[in-house]
Amino acid sequence: MAASIVRRLGPLVAGRGLRLRGGCVCNQSFKRSFATERQDRNLLYEHAREGYSALPLLDMESLCAYPEDAARALDLRKGELRSKDLPGIISTWQELRQLREQIRSLEEEKEAVTEAVRALVVNQDNSQVQQDPQYQSLRARGREIRKQLTLLYPKEAQLEEQFYLRALRLPNQTHPDVPVGDESQARVLHVVGDKPAFSFQPRGHLEIAEKLDIIRQKRLSHVSGHRSYYLRGAGALLQHGLVNFTLNKLIHRGFTPMTVPDLLRGVVFEGCGMTPNAKPSQIYNIDPSRFEDLNLAGTAEVGLAGYFMDHSVAFRDLPIRMVCSSTCYRAETDTGKEPWGLYRVHHFTKVEMFGVTGPGLEQSSELLEEFLSLQMEILTELGLHFRVLDMPTQELGLPAYRKFDIEAWMPGRGRFGEVTSASNCTDFQSRRLHIMFQTEAGELQFAHTVNATGCAVPRLLIALLESYQQKDGSVLVPPALQPYLGTDRITTPTHVPLQYIGPNQPQKPRLPGQPASS
């Protein structure tokens, strides 16, 4: 693959500040221009162009067959592209396909000419061959073919880049039953349980947790920045309990446990339908002057998809179900929404489900329903009141064909809040990352991928603390978590909470060696 790309791009790279290194096309000004040009690049295309992977095989045939439907669907979703961009993408694809067919035909003819010349050389001595009109004609035709290919390869590379830089921004197709519009148009599918009743005004989770000294979020801007937090004692045990409760349930149901890297290349993010180069982005980018193209994952979905990237699985092993607990990092934009509390934070622990299925919507849709059923089972066993939403077109992002969210009731906030999400990405991710399965006959086909939240710890902590709070300030522990905490109630701590001794306080304590104030 790399050799083929180098051969074809050779005449083109010289004029673009590139040189060939070890079979790859390498930009000598890459590190110098990374910070300023990164947002204009497509790492997924570059990854393939440099020979590390095959080019994404987008389903352009379906798009070209029903362009009007694709254009309507494009306008109903959020994203950079609109229906007016579609004709240009299609025409570029068609031109590229015709050019590749022309190149393929010439390459086949070139091979045939080479074989014919070789046969003449074998059957005649050198002096006879040089005088043979057929030999001279074949040599002339060979030179003409090479000349044509030398002109066509750069054109192919230019069209290829033009196509992929736009086509890779196209979203997945949309399920016909998905509601149209923004999040306000979400369709309620199920409502489970009842709102907890209180004989007092319910408090918010942060007020509850600070009095129990199990969450600390104050005075951390100089320690770990805004939207960070500490969990202590029962707070930490609640996190471990939620993670272990979820992992145990899913492993018992046949899921394979995984751990994944927190640092991943941008190509994996883009293959999953995320944009590490967006401005602003929710993805933390590691300093490119030291570590070229490394990013902190905001979900284990990225690492799990990367595990299957450029690999095939056996058909008999489908569907594959993976589960992973990881720390997630998200650069939440400073919109002023939820500035305090655990609802929007920069780091949190989450258990993620990830599935790989065979082709066809039936199999991936069944797995999506299975994941949703497991989510509902987990929340039901935790005793939470929640509702299941069929998310509308503008909430699907790039990769989702269909997406279900679950919102749990949070009494202190006085409203529902999202706690889980489940998406069927069909073959959107697999076509970009080459996640495939091998049939019994040995044929490779693109798989479908499905992902779902198993347990997002901070938001479940909100729902649990606010739903199980008591008038005396204690919090009941749901039976499902009691084995992990060793108690049925979280009560006021027996220890003395930390006392702040830093600046900006009304009455400062006397430090060692400091004279008493008069």
Swiss-Prot record:
One of its GO terms (molecular function) is tRNA binding. L-serine binds at residues 299-301, 352, 453. Its main location: mitochondrion. It catalyses: tRNA(Ser) + L-serine + ATP = L-seryl-tRNA(Ser) + AMP + diphosphate + H(+); tRNA(Sec) + L-serine + ATP = L-seryl-tRNA(Sec) + AMP + diphosphate + H(+). Catalyzes the attachment of serine to tRNA(Ser). Is also probably able to aminoacylate tRNA(Sec) with serine, to form the misacylated tRNA L-seryl-tRNA(Sec), which will be further converted into selenocysteinyl-tRNA(Sec). Homodimer. The tRNA molecule probably binds across the dimer. This is Serine--tRNA ligase, mitochondrial. It comes from Bos taurus (Bovine).
